[in-house]
Amino acid sequence: MAKFASIITLLFAALVVFAAFEAPTMVEAKLCERSSGTWSGVCGNNNACKNQCIRLEGAQHGSCNYVFPAHKCICYFPC
């Protein structure tokens, strides 16, 4: 019986140690996409689109996406 109790205690201690090392998860806000209001022409440079969305429009990020009939700069904002 004493051996069983020590095994249970050891398992509980291991569970506590593993739980202590688990990284907390962060919940990210959902992002909504919107065509850039400041971009003109066809979007061919993802980095330039991203920088323009962040700096000029206050978006989280941006990228060139195909929206019929051409690639457009799309900015991503919190919903």
Swiss-Prot record:
UniProt-listed Gene3D superfamilies: Knottin, scorpion toxin-like
Sorted UniProt keywords: Antimicrobial, Disulfide bond, Fungicide, Plant defense, Secreted, Signal
Function: Possesses antifungal activity sensitive to inorganic cations.
UniProt similarity note: Belongs to the DEFL family.
Localization, UniProt: Secreted
Species: Brassica napus
UniProt cross-references to SUPFAM superfamilies, sorted A to Z: Scorpion toxin-like
Main location: secreted
Signal sequence annotation: 1-29
Matches recorded under InterPro entries: Defensin_plant, Scorpion_toxin-like, Scorpion_toxin-like_sf
Pfam families linked to this entry: Gamma-thionin
Protein name as catalogued: Defensin-like protein 3
GO BP terms in the entry: defense response to fungus; killing of cells of another organism
Gene Ontology CC entries for this record: extracellular region
Disulfide bonding pattern of the chain: 32-79, 43-64, 49-73, 53-75
